[in-house]
């Protein structure tokens, strides 16, 4: 029974739950970005480049012969995935940058308070004693 209790404590901790929520939201965000890149961003870019469909861009290493399929390097899909990655990485960068700036504001050191009345009086007494000796 001890193992189950430990697992329950581990699974219910804030960090694990936060991480799980982050993973689910991240996966959904990735799908949104992929749909945006595939359906909205790449078609106009392909049109500007002379009607190129990035999904069909490939380097044929060996033509199809008989029953054997062609051997190709599909670099167009790679280009689209690279654009996906850049957009997601930039969005994550902006989020992390915002969080870091909030942390810096919270951690900003407060100016230390000036000396108390007792410290000032002790300093004056010290100075007077130095003058007498």
Curated annotation (Swiss-Prot):
Q: How does it sit in the membrane?
A: Multi-pass membrane protein
Q: Which GO cellular component does the record give, naming just one?
A: plasma membrane
Q: Cite the Pfam families for this sequence.
A: MscL
SUPFAM superfamilies assigned: Gated mechanosensitive channel (SSF81330)
For this UniProt record, the keywords arranged alphabetically read as follows:
Cell inner membrane, Cell membrane, Ion channel, Ion transport, Membrane, Transmembrane, Transmembrane helix, Transport
GO molecular-function terms, A-Z: mechanosensitive monoatomic ion channel activity
Q: Which Gene3D superfamilies match?
A: Large-conductance mechanosensitive channel, MscL, domain 1
TM ranges are 10-30, 76-96
Q: Where in the cell is it found?
A: Cell inner membrane
Q: What does this protein do?
A: Channel that opens in response to stretch forces in the membrane lipid bilayer. May participate in the regulation of osmotic pressure changes within the cell.
Its family? Answer: Belongs to the MscL family.
Quaternary structure? Homopentamer.
PANTHER family (UniProt xref): LARGE-CONDUCTANCE MECHANOSENSITIVE CHANNEL (PTHR30266:SF2), MECHANOSENSITIVE CHANNEL MSCL (PTHR30266)
User: Under what name is this protein listed?
Assistant: Large-conductance mechanosensitive channel
Protein source organism = Chlorobium phaeobacteroides (strain BS1)
Q: Taxonomic classification, please?
A: Bacteria, Pseudomonadati, Chlorobiota, Chlorobiia, Chlorobiales
């Amino acid at each position: 029974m001890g193992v189950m209790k430990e697992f329950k404590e581990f699974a219910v901790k804030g960090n694990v739950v936060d991480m799980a929520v982050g993973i689910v939201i991240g996966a959904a965000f990735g799908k949104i970005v992929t749909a945006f890149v595939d359906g909205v961003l790449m078609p106009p870019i392909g049109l500007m480049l002379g009607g190129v469909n990035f999904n069909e861009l490939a380097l044929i290493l060996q033509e199809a012969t008989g029953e054997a399929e062609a051997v190709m390097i599909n670099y167009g899909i790679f280009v689209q995935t690279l654009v996906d990655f850049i957009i997601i990485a930039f969005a994550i960068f902006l989020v992390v940058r915002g969080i870091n700036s909030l942390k810096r504001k919270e951690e900003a050191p407060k100016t230390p308070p000036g000396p108390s009345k007792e410290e000032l009086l002790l300093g004056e007494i010290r100075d007077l004693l130095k003058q007498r000796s």
